[in-house]
A protein has these predicted regions:
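Ubiquitin-like/PB1-type beta-grasp interaction modules and other compact soluble beta-rich domains
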Residues: 1-65
Length: 66
């Protein structure tokens, strides 16, 4: 399955969930927000959220700075 993750093309197995894709981007437990095709998905929904070929996934990681 072909996805666009943070603006880059990514190939994932058919049936991959949003949680699977997030784990390929970060192992952070906190400070992560995710959207599919512009719609924010709550963390509780990541394991059940099935992706479709062509979906655009944005994974945002909060960072502190000074």
């Amino acid at each position: 399955m072909e996805l666009i993750v943070n603006g880059a093309p990514v190939t994932t197995p058919t049936g991959a969930t949003l949680a699977d894709v997030v784990r390929t981007v970060t192992d952070a437990d906190r400070g992560v927000a995710v959207a599919i095709n512009g719609e924010v998905v709550p963390r509780s929904g990541w394991p059940a959220e099935q992706l479709c070929d062509g979906d655009r996934v944005e994974v945002l990681i909060a960072a502190q700075g000074g």
